[in-house]
């Protein structure tokens, strides 16, 4: 099974960060939620889950693992339609990616134990709502 990583990154000058009209930080010009700066250690992965040479790594500039990354194209080339997903910012990146995968008719499983948010408390997500 191929292992695919995505990591959210932005340019150092922030020129590729989107400020939404509903974002309270629009007035200041500083986004409230930022990605890691491309090329810095923060944009990498912890040693425990670091990519191996045979794994695939894609940079992403939006919440989805698919938008503008090449992940969908790789899955087609590998003739894969099943996904197992885990990741950070569960209520943003994981949920967005799962919804897009569903729209692309990909069979998707989210491993709850492999998902995390930015706070010590569990982040309510679609997977925990009833």
Show the residue positions of the predicted features.
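Catalytic-core segment of enzymes that process non-peptidic bonds
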Residues: 5-15, 19-21
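Short beta-strand segments at enzyme active-site cores
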Residues: 1-8, 111
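Active-site-adjacent betaalpha module
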Residues: 16-18, 22-130
């Amino acid at each position: 099974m191929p292992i695919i990583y995505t990591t959210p990154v932005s340019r150092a000058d922030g020129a590729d960060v989107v400020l939404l009209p509903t974002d309270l930080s629009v007035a200041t010009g500083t986004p409230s939620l930022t990605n890691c700066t491309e090329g810095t250690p923060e944009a990498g992965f912890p040693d425990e889950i670091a990519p191996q040479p045979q794994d695939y790594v894609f940079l992403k500039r939006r919440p989805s693992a698919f938008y503008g990354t090449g992940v969908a194209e790789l899955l087609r080339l590998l003739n894969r339609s099943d996904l197992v997903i885990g990741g950070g910012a569960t209520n943003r990146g994981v949920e967005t990616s799962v919804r897009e995968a569903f729209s692309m008719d990909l069979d998707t499983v989210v491993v709850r134990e492999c998902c995390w948010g930015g706070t010590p408390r569990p982040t309510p997500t679609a997977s925990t709502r009833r």
